[in-house]
């Protein structure tokens, strides 16, 4: 069941949001399963989140909308950060063609909402809030037109919403400040072959292969800046020492359990013990790069495209060429900054800061309440992280 925002509430949310961050840099988060830290990183960096656009992918569109609403409502952020429904399925690819391709070229460990045993994220059939007045693609267009050359889009799911928006308004990309994507793995076959199903999944380019044609359309558009957070997003993990640091900064587990202002911390640490098989900070790393560009400590430039040949074993994979070998005809490419390393100590510190702050007043007056200024060192990995590239 969906509860749409009334027009007056949507307008009020826009006014409040403008008040809360009128002078901030602007960001739109496009994702198939929003996480807490994606929102909190942007707020901590004093970015203005214009909205969240949901899409199919890891989850169905309905589940993606539910997760976005859940993330925002936890911090009382629903009425100043609107969310919008995007594509419910790819434009071209179907589950049938997806399965046939796997029979021809090999299976993916993770298939998102096409997983045969897929289970809804909204297990209790809860109601949730999102804006039904316009689509995600139209929202992106409207915001870029209203804020030319000011908006960073963080795309951490399949890129169908962006492809639709670009088909409606081809000048969208060149009027945007930058596009940061989560995806675009390169040179990862050794890790996939030798690391078992877990590592194979970690380096499967899900956001590209769910709809390669949309990914190619979006990635090779005329963005002033294209930042690809690929391999690096599969190399930064949560740790027990990270959990311990969050708990210490929040004043202990008892305080986390009793203080409603620490709801994000509570959701993150659970019972205080790191679960086995924890996944890396995929989308969070991309959002951190968008929030704090200085977190990047190594990268290189390449001209990129996405393989859109269905009869190719690399269908849906990112391809790269150097500047002097860019195709002059045929395949369209775009210059991208390929991120290969971040300051992991800084990343963990941003997690501490984000999860132990209190956001319930943000929509009313832009206030984020933080605990006393404590710096917790993470002993698991405070070095810079680089990976396969």
Swiss-Prot record:
Compartments where located: Endoplasmic reticulum lumen
The entry's keywords: Endoplasmic reticulum, Glycosidase, Hydrolase, Signal
Coiled coil: none
Keyword Endoplasmic reticulum attached: yes
GO aspect biological process, one term: purine nucleoside catabolic process
Subcellular location, principal: endoplasmic reticulum
Keyword Ubl conjugation found: no
Pfam families: IU_nuc_hydro
GO MF term (any one): purine nucleosidase activity
Entry's Gene Ontology cellular component terms: cytosol; endoplasmic reticulum; endoplasmic reticulum lumen
Signal peptide: 1-23
Family: Belongs to the IUNH family.
PANTHER family: INOSINE-URIDINE PREFERRING NUCLEOSIDE HYDROLASE, INOSINE_URIDINE-PREFERRING NUCLEOSIDE HYDROLASE DOMAIN-CONTAINING PROTEIN
Stated name of the protein: Uncharacterized protein C800.11
């Amino acid at each position: 069941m969906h509860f749409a925002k009334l027009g007056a509430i949507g307008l009020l949310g826009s006014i409040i949001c403008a008040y809360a961050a009128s002078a901030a840099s602007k960001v739109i988060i496009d994702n198939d399963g929003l996480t807490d830290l994606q929102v909190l990183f942007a707020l901590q960096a004093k970015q203005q989140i214009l909205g969240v656009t949901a899409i199919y992918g890891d989850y169905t569109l309905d589940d993606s909308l539910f997760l976005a609403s859940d993330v925002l409502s936890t911090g009382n952020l629903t009425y100043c950060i609107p969310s919008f429904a995007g594509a419910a399925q790819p434009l071209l690819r179907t589950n049938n063609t997806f399965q046939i391709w796997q029979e021809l070229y090999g299976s993916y460990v993770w298939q998102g909402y096409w997983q045969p045993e897929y289970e809804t994220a909204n297990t209790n059939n809860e109601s949730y809030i999102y804006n039904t007045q316009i689509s995600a693609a139209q929202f992106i267009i409207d915001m870029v037109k209203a804020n030319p050359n000011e908006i960073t889009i963080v795309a951490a799911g399949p890129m169908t919403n962006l492809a639709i928006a670009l088909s409606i308004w081809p000048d969208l990309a060149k009027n945007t400040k930058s596009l940061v994507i989560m995806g675009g793995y390169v040179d990862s076959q050794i890790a996939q072959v030798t690391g078992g199903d877990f590592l194979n999944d970690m380096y499967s380019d899900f956001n590209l292969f769910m709809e390669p044609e949309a990914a190619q359309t979006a990635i090779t558009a005329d963005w002033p800046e294209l930042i690809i957070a690929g391999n690096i997003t599969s190399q930064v993990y949560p740790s027990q020492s990270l959990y311990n640091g969050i708990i210490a900064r929040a004043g202990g587990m008892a305080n986390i359990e009793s203080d409603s202002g620490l709801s994000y911390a509570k959701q993150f640490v659970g019972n205080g013990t790191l679960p086995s098989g924890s996944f890396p900070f995929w989308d969070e790393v991309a959002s951190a790069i968008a929030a704090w560009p200085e977190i990047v400590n190594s990268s290189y430039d390449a001209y990129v495209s996405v393989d859109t040949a269905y009869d190719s074993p690399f269908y849906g994979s990112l391809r790269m060429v150097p500047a002097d070998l860019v195709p002059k005809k045929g395949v369209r490419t775009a210059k991208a900054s390929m991120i290969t390393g971040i300051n992991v100590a800084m990343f963990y510190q941003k997690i501490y800061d984000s999860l132990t702050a209190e956001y319930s007043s943000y929509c009313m007056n832009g206030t984020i309440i933080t605990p006393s200024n404590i710096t917790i060192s993470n002993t698991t990995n405070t070095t810079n992280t680089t990976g396969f590239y």
